[in-house]
Amino acid sequence: MKKVEAIIKPFKLDEVKEALQEAGIQGLSVIEVKGFGRQKGHTELYRGAEYVVDFLPKVKIEMVLPDEMVDIAIEAIVGAARTEKIGDGKIFVSSIEQAIRIRTGETGEDAV
């Protein structure tokens, strides 16, 4: 099992969710996050003073998948989230040792 984490632009969330559903992937967590990378921040004017906004709003999607679904998920995310502009985001894949469904006690891939 693998955990796939994708950090994307917030306005791309619906497209990414639909692409994942069309690929047969269900069950994900969505977290509002802030961050910066090469995109950096921008300046804003507030009550006559200029402020540097370092952290930009992003959305983090997390899902745990069987190994054979990881490439499918990555293709769906990249296809739906790409704008070809700086700040499109990143995808991280890591190994998961164990998963347990609390309600039933199922473990492993049966739990996801």
From Swiss-Prot:
The keyword Transcription applies. InterPro entries: N-reg_PII, N-reg_PII-like_a/b, N-reg_PII/ATP_PRibTrfase_C, N-reg_PII_CS, N-reg_PII_urydylation_site. Pfam families: P-II. SMART domains: P-II (SM00938). GO terms for molecular function: ATP binding; enzyme regulator activity. One of its GO terms (biological process) is regulation of nitrogen utilization. The modification O-UMP-tyrosine is found at residue 51. GO terms for cellular component: cytosol. The keyword RNA-binding does not apply. Keywords: Nitrogen fixation, Nucleotide-binding, Phosphoprotein, Transcription, Transcription regulation. SUPFAM superfamilies: GlnB-like. Belongs to the P(II) protein family. Homotrimer. PANTHER family: NITROGEN REGULATORY PROTEIN P-II, NITROGEN REGULATORY PROTEIN P-II HOMOLOG. P-II indirectly controls the transcription of the glutamine synthetase gene (glnA). P-II prevents NR-II-catalyzed conversion of NR-I to NR-I-phosphate, the transcriptional activator of glnA. When P-II is uridylylated to P-II-UMP, these events are reversed. When the ratio of Gln to 2-ketoglutarate decreases, P-II is uridylylated to P-II-UMP, which causes the deadenylation of glutamine synthetase, so activating the enzyme. This is Nitrogen regulatory protein P-II. It comes from Rhodobacter capsulatus (Rhodopseudomonas capsulata).
